[in-house]
Amino acid sequence: MSNISLIVGLGNPGSEYAQTRHNAGFWFVEQLADKYGITIKNDPKFHGISGRGNIEGHDVRLLLPMTYMNRSGQSVVPFSKFYQIAPEAILIAHDELDMNPGVIRLKTGGGHGGHNGLRDIVPHIGPNFHRLRIGIGHPGSKERVSGHVLGKAPSSEQSLMDGAIDHALSKVKLLVQGQVPQAMNQINAYKPA
């Protein structure tokens, strides 16, 4: 099993989107950077914000595409190709409509599952990367999805998402060590307090 050496957070750039549910992937990577003291800075060559640092003795790159969600591939694809990072060594953190707030799942492979950020990445690097799916809940009807993902969660939901993200952050050491099955078991077993 490959060591994870690129961790990507999906979201939308700009302060107006910073606290919206669609930015759950950004939240994860920003908190990871804080936890390990990794500076992330503007990286115009790859249309994003990136950083490189040491996580538990492993060299890891972080990337936040600044392309807007639907064009995430314009950042992730050239970045991973330039640094020669195989899909199996990539973790992409993103919001997940089909899971409730407080639920978090690590998954390897699969399609885009209707997620527009993944939809722009999968055709170019294939499906074999790892996904950290952060539950944001579904509004109930398809017509309300856009407003839901681009809306701010009430504090009760936000605290559930924060707890799930904190739990996943504590398992990153397993991912960078290549212990993906163990990380998957521990992340997927999480239950909100």
UniProtKB/Swiss-Prot annotation:
- Residues annotated as binding tRNA are 17, 68, 70, 116
Sorted alphabetically, the keyword list is: Cytoplasm, Hydrolase, RNA-binding, tRNA-binding
Return one GO MF term.
peptidyl-tRNA hydrolase activity
* Record CDD domains: PTH
The enzyme's main class, written as a single word, is: hydrolase
Q: What is its EC number?
A: 3.1.1.29
Where in the cell? Answer: Cytoplasm
Q: Which GO terms describe its cellular component?
A: cytoplasm
Gene Ontology biological-process entries: protein quality control for misfolded or incompletely synthesized proteins; rescue of stalled ribosome
Q: Catalytic positions?
A: 22
Q: Which reaction does it catalyse?
A: an N-acyl-L-alpha-aminoacyl-tRNA + H2O = an N-acyl-L-amino acid + a tRNA + H(+)
| Pfam families attached to this UniProt entry | Pept_tRNA_hydro
What the entry lists under InterPro entries is as follows: Pept_tRNA_hydro, Pept_tRNA_hydro_CS, Pept_tRNA_hydro_sf
Subcellular location, principal: cytoplasm
> What PROSITE patterns does this protein's entry cite?
PEPT_TRNA_HYDROL_1, PEPT_TRNA_HYDROL_2
Described function:
Hydrolyzes ribosome-free peptidyl-tRNAs (with 1 or more amino acids incorporated), which drop off the ribosome during protein synthesis, or as a result of ribosome stalling. Catalyzes the release of premature peptidyl moieties from peptidyl-tRNA molecules trapped in stalled 50S ribosomal subunits, and thus maintains levels of free tRNAs and 50S ribosomes.
Whom does it interact with, and what assembly results? Monomer.
The protein's name in its UniProt record: Peptidyl-tRNA hydrolase
